[in-house]
From Swiss-Prot:
Sequence ranges assigned to domain GB1/RHD3-type G in this UniProt record: 87-310
GO terms (BP aspect): endoplasmic reticulum membrane fusion
Cytoplasmic face residues: 1-721, 767-829
InterPro entries documented for this protein: G_GB1_RHD3_dom, P-loop_NTPase, RHD3/Sey1, Sey1/RHD3-like_3HB
Source species: Cryptococcus neoformans var. neoformans serotype D (strain JEC21 / ATCC MYA-565) (Filobasidiella neoformans)
Chief subcellular location: endoplasmic reticulum
Keyword field: Coiled coil, Endoplasmic reticulum, GTP-binding, Hydrolase, Membrane, Nucleotide-binding, Transmembrane, Transmembrane helix
Protein name per its UniProtKB record: Protein SEY1
Length: 829
């Protein structure tokens, strides 16, 4: 099967590199190029053969159609042509000339474009409106402008003027295409069109102002390409003729008063090139085209056409907006103000760039916004923000600095303000988080510091404040962005206030702990001496108690003031603390005194004092009462001396009034937990009321009487002792029994066992425990006897009255004495 057609179709659909180079070669005849394009049309679409990769789908674009409408597709096409991101690294060239003079063919040969060319057999208009196509050999936008002097428009020159104005405002180089034989003619050489160009140029750059020298970007190069040059007329003559014609046209223009002396070279540079006849001399034509192309591509050549002075300084990504604005003003016949158009373009593009940059900036900042809002301190946030700002401004500067400088600077300031406003909540949030964390760390530092042995609270607080401030300032300075009006002094002042509040609270707590510790020490130092003094009451008892109290309080105050220096307490705080300490110490003394003046304690003290006087002599030896002793006198003396001590417990009454302490104010108790009732200074020195004294006196007298009866009974029992002769009777009568025990083995063994047991008990020291057990048993037996006696003598009124009295818990000896007293009375009756 013959597959040649299929292979040919594949080659046309995906032409090899050699075919593409052949199609792009300017020396390839138009007829051959057109034939290949027609063959490729069914596979790759019209007009794509021989175009570079970036422009395969859309090699050219009609930016202004025959209805004078500007296209909306210029920006997408610039992107397809890989020119949208070139910045200023691109050039624009346009061609003028009469209709059907080979302008499109010239552009296709020079730049490798794909503009439609005229069908030579029909000689009719080919280019309608304004077309644009990228160069194959450089970053150049080529505009093919509809030819002038065409029969289709006739005498309507409106579009010629508009296209000239548009091209002059947009391009760097104007190529004027004319035949050699047209030089010297007015209409044939497009002198009318050139006059229009000059007039338009004056309208654009010469209106108003006193400056006769245009700015560099206001200059344009006019390149005359002389076609079908056969060499009969030297090129220098042709150049001179065209230059003279240009100057004559320039001089004939009606100029403003301030531009009367303006010369052509201030606004235009003239350049010339000649091409041989395309049909008669095709090889030389192609060589001349290649040479001319070098002037557009080789920057090292002296005659390089795209000089910086000609560039309109419009970034590539703003070309579409700029040209559309130019055309709209041209279309509405308004005065075209290029600087205004450039400013409008700059505003539009700067706003677009700013929006894109700001959105990217917000996306970057989003990653830390949530942690900051959650209360966390983000490490290195300042560096991150500065990096975001630098990146955003770098992108903006890269893309927007190409536009109008004043607009760019203004928009940059606006963007910077927006960026700063967006970062300000992060700055404030970071400061608040630093504030919160530093206050927490400060509290922990104080708690840890007061646990150290021998700590100085003032040093701990100052050191903690210093560290907290240093950490806060370091974090605040790190997060502060340059060129902002952000301040952290207010937050620092709030931090200082919070640190002071925390320090004051901790100082109050530590002061309270110190006062409590001193109070406990005061209690320990007061309570024991008070108890000792009141257990041995004398007339100077209160002097001893109050002197001890005064010394302890004075030492406690000195200890407090010594420690309070490190707390930086104020005089008012010291006064309050000392008042609290004195009040608590006084209340502690009062409670101890009330404890020592309770009924049981006072009775015990009186009984002990009475017994020491009644039962013991001056040498402290226990008394054994004999019949000749005056027991009544001793009893009365001991009783009276003891009762004389009872009033000492009634009031705090030192021998010197100066020993009485200063009472705390009559306010609620300082020790609410122990005594929630208010302090009453009117009863501060009263311990026992008169009623209480009478009750204690009565109870003591009963105890003393019981002691007297016991002493009396012991003296009677010592008088009624066993006679001596009774012992002789016992020996005589018990002799036989004793002999029986000694000579009876069983009884003798029992006696030996008892003797050995007694010896062992004495040697092991068990006599005391055995006697204690025996006394307990005897006490129980005695209680049973007393109970039986009560039952037996229940009918006797006096015995019933005495036995009905409650037994106090003073001691078992008191109960015994009362029982003996009852039995003695019963025996007397």
């Amino acid at each position: 099967m013959n597959q040649t057609p299929q292979i040919a179709q594949d080659l046309l659909k995906n032409p090899p590199q050699e075919l593409q180079q052949l199609l792009n070669d300017p020396r390839t005849p138009d007829s051959a190029r057109k034939a290949v394009q027609e063959l490729q049309a069914p596979f790759v679409g019209p007009g794509t053969a021989g175009n570079k990769d970036g422009a395969k789908e859309s090699p050219r674009l009609q930016i202004v159609n025959e209805n004078q409408e500007f296209t909306k597709e210029l920006s997408p096409y610039l992107a397809k042509w890989d020119l949208l991101d070139k910045g200023f690294a691109y050039d624009v060239v346009a061609v003028f000339g009469s209709q059907s003079t080979g302008k499109s063919t010239l552009l296709n040969r020079l730049f490798g474009t794909t503009f439609d060319v005229m069908d030579e057999s029909k000689r009719q208009q080919t280019t309608k409106g304004i077309w644009m196509c990228p160069s194959q050999y450089s970053n150049t936008l080529v505009m093919d402008v509809e030819g002038t002097d065409g029969r289709e428009r006739g005498e309507d020159q409106d579009f010629e003027r508009k296209s000239a104005l548009f091209s002059l405002a947009s391009t760097e180089v104007l190529i004027v295409n004319l035949w050699e034989h047209q030089i010297g003619l007015y209409n044939g050489a497009n002198m009318g069109l050139l006059k229009t160009v000059f007039e338009v140029n004056l309208g654009l750059f010469g209106g108003g102002g006193d400056n006769t020298k245009p700015k560099p970007q206001e200059k344009t190069l006019i390149l005359f390409v002389i076609r079908d040059h056969v060499g009969a007329t030297p090129m220098s003559n042709l150049t001179a003729t065209l230059t003279q014609d240009m100057e004559r046209i320039w001089d004939s223009l009606s100029k403003p008063a301030h531009l009367e002396d303006a010369v052509l070279s201030s606004y235009f540079d003239l350049s010339f090139a000649a091409l041989p006849h395309k049909v008669l001399m095709p090889e030389k034509f192609e060589e001349a085209v290649l040479e001319l192309r070098q002037r557009f591509t080789d920057r090292s050549r002296e005659d390089y056409v795209f000089q910086p002075a000609y560039h309109k300084r419009i970034p590539a990504d703003g070309v579409s907006f700029y040209m559309e604005g130019i055309w709209q003003q041209v279309l509405t016949n308004k005065d075209l103000d290029l600087p205004t158009q450039q400013e409008l373009l700059a505003q539009f593009r700067c706003d677009e760039i700013s929006t894109v940059v700001f959105e990217a900036f917000l996306a970057s900042a989003k990653i830390v916004r949530r942690p900051v809002e959650a209360g966390s301190v983000v490490e290195g946030l300042g560096a991150l923000m500065r990096d975001w700002l630098e990146t955003a401004l770098g992108k903006f500067d890269r893309d927007a600095s190409r536009y109008h400088s004043a607009v760019y600077q203004r928009k940059r300031l606006d963007l910077l303000a927006s960026l700063h406003a967006s970062l300000s909540p992060l700055f404030l949030g970071q400061l608040k988080n630093l504030h919160k964390i530093e206050t927490a760390k400060f509290s922990k530092d104080i708690v840890a510091g007061v646990k150290e042995p021998g700590y100085d609270f003032g040093v701990v607080v100052e050191e903690g404040k210093r560290r907290a401030r240093e950490r806060f300032l370091a974090g605040a300075k790190e997060v502060k962005v340059e060129e902002t009006d952000w301040e952290y002094e207010h937050e620092l002042a709030l931090l200082d206030e919070d640190l002071k509040l925390i320090a004051d609270k901790c100082r109050a707590d530590e002061t309270k702990k110190m006062v409590n510790a001193i109070e406990r020490n005061v209690k320990r130092q007061i309570l024991e001496p008070v108890e000792v003094a009141m257990s041995q009451p004398t007339k100077t008892m209160w002097d001893t108690v109050l002197k001890t109290y005064s010394d302890v309080i004075e030492a406690a105050e000195e200890a407090y003031l010594s420690k309070a220096k490190s707390y930086n307490c104020s005089d008012e705080e010291n006064s309050t603390a000392l008042a609290s300490l004195r009040a608590r110490a006084w209340l502690a003394l009062r409670r101890k005194l009330e404890e020592q003046t309770s009924d049981s304690t006072v009775l015990t003290t009186l009984r002990t004092k009475f017994e020491d006087s009644f039962r013991y002599d001056e040498a402290g030896v226990p008394r054994v009462w004999r019949p000749e002793d005056d027991i009544e006198a001793a009893f009365r003396k001991a009783k009276d001396e003891t009762l004389g001590l009872l009033p000492l417990f009634a009031n705090i009454a030192p021998t010197e009034g100066s020993l009485l302490p200063e009472l705390p104010p009559p306010e609620p108790s300082f020790d609410v937990e122990s005594d929630p009732s208010p302090f009453d200074p009117s009863t501060a020195f009263t311990l026992l009321t008169a009623t209480k004294l009478l009750s204690l006196e009565s109870r003591f007298k009963r105890d003393a009487d019981a002691a007297y009866v016991e002493a009396k009974r012991s003296m009677v029992s010592s008088v009624a002792q066993i006679p001596v002769w009774m012992y002789g009777v016992l020996v005589v009568l018990g002799w036989n029994e004793a002999m029986a025990v000694l000579f009876n083995p069983l009884y003798f063994a029992m006696l030996l066992v008892l003797a050995a047991s007694g010896y062992i008990i004495l040697q092991l020291g068990l006599a005391g425990p055995i006697l204690q057990i025996a006394s307990t048993v005897i006490r129980e037996i005695r209680q049973m006897v007393v109970k039986k006696l009560r039952e037996a003598f229940a009918d006797v009124p006096e015995a019933q009255r005495i036995l009905a009295q409650p037994v106090t818990a003073s001691s078992s000896d008191e109960q015994e004495r009362k029982g003996d007293l009852i039995k003695g009375e019963m025996l007397e009756k």
